[in-house]
Amino acid sequence: MLNYTELENKNVLVVGLAKSGYEAAKLLLKLGANVKVNDGKDLSQDAHAKDLESMGIEVISGSHPFSLLDDDPIIVKNPGIPYTVSIIKEATNRGLKILTEVELSYLISEAPIIAVTGTNGKTTVTSLIGDMFQKSVLTGRLSGNIGYVASKVAQEVKSDEYLITELSSFQLLGIEEYKPHIAIITNIYSAHLDYHETLENYQNAKKQIYKNQTKDDYLICNYHQRHLIESENLEAKTFYFSTQQEVDGIYIKDGFIVFNGIRIINTKDLVLPGEHNLENILAAVLASIIAGVPVKAIVDSLVTFSGIDHRLQYIGTNRTNKYYNDSKATNTLATQFALNSFDQPIIWLCGGLDRGNEFDELIPYMENVRVMVVFGETQDKFAKLGNSQGKYVIKATDVEDAVDKIQDIVEPNDVVLLSPACASWDQYHTFEERGEKFIDRFRAHLPSY
């Protein structure tokens, strides 16, 4: 295992800048390494690149010259850089050591780790665990794919605190020594095949989360996908979660969350909506119990935690209508979960960037949809879908116009749901911007007293 003290005076090449590459480069400089940064994009006007250069770090951008490998550097790879990128392939061929930014964070911290991965739900689970810690006397620091760069947070967390880390498949691919004390796999579905090429490769990347665990560690998995790990040579203590049956772990029985025969909370008291979020809640509760969070703090969190911004986020009620912002739903699977979360009639706001998808797979989930308000490049596709199912379809220019147009047709107890099933880039820079526009427009229609 590489000790971080061994990085002093070593040549290190950070490939890929962005936030994680920027923080990794600063950390490596602090550890005494001879650092260079390389990015295929032109970074001549990039603020982070200029900041690194002011520290004496050489930044080479616009291409990946193989000459950067001639002094046999250790490679620290940004998770967004595929292993198929030319300079990474060449480094592999030369037998150079390639670290991920997450691996670097592991090398410098002695804090126990709760690591969360999965196709869906990982951000919610990570944030909910963090909230449960916050409600207790324990300290947990969020990091990773949730927006807080792991190598930065790892420098700040103390050995008696927990590092609560969300990990994407990109971050897990290529880890060597990384070992969480508690690992969670929420679920695994087909995703990111443009990066991983095959479903098997994607699944194997996710499984990296537990490969170094020992008998003193814990693995938490979805019981209904247990076949994905049953053939594995697991050393960690393995527990499951299920909303459908009693399992060795945590489950729902008679309307209560139950662990070890003890009722934790009635599901009617949960604020977070949706069957899929029940699974997320179970995983978070189990991890927090294992970590030593008191049950009272867990319950205090569950009766107040309303979700993550832009992920089936309850934003308020106007008259008798509840509004939910699910702008993060940039694919059909996420929207399936959203549509399946409500028994009330739904006014569904949908549409966005056209990636050539068809949306017929949403039909089985549209039973409660009363009105569709469609916008963006996929507007006509969604209009066709709605008409084929006999739904009332309204065309809008964008999200703001969609909120305006429903004001005269909304009925008592309708749920207003923004769940686009598409990326935002046809009209907005990010899904966050799209969600904020939705929230702002909702607030504009609130009555003033």
From Swiss-Prot:
SUPFAM superfamilies linked: MurCD N-terminal domain, MurD-like peptide ligases, catalytic domain, MurD-like peptide ligases, peptide-binding domain
Q: Give binding positions for ATP.
A: G118, T119, N120, G121, K122, T123, T124
Q: Which pathway does the UniProt entry assign to this protein?
A: Cell wall biogenesis; peptidoglycan biosynthesis
A GO BP entry is: regulation of cell shape
Q: Can you tell me which family this protein belongs to?
A: Belongs to the MurCDEF family.
- Biological role: Cell wall formation. Catalyzes the addition of glutamate to the nucleotide precursor UDP-N-acetylmuramoyl-L-alanine (UMA).
Q: Which HAMAP family match?
A: MurD
Question: Could you tell me what this protein is called?
Answer: UDP-N-acetylmuramoylalanine--D-glutamate ligase
Organism field: Staphylococcus epidermidis (strain ATCC 12228 / FDA PCI 1200)
List the lineage, top down: Bacteria, Bacillati, Bacillota, Bacilli, Bacillales
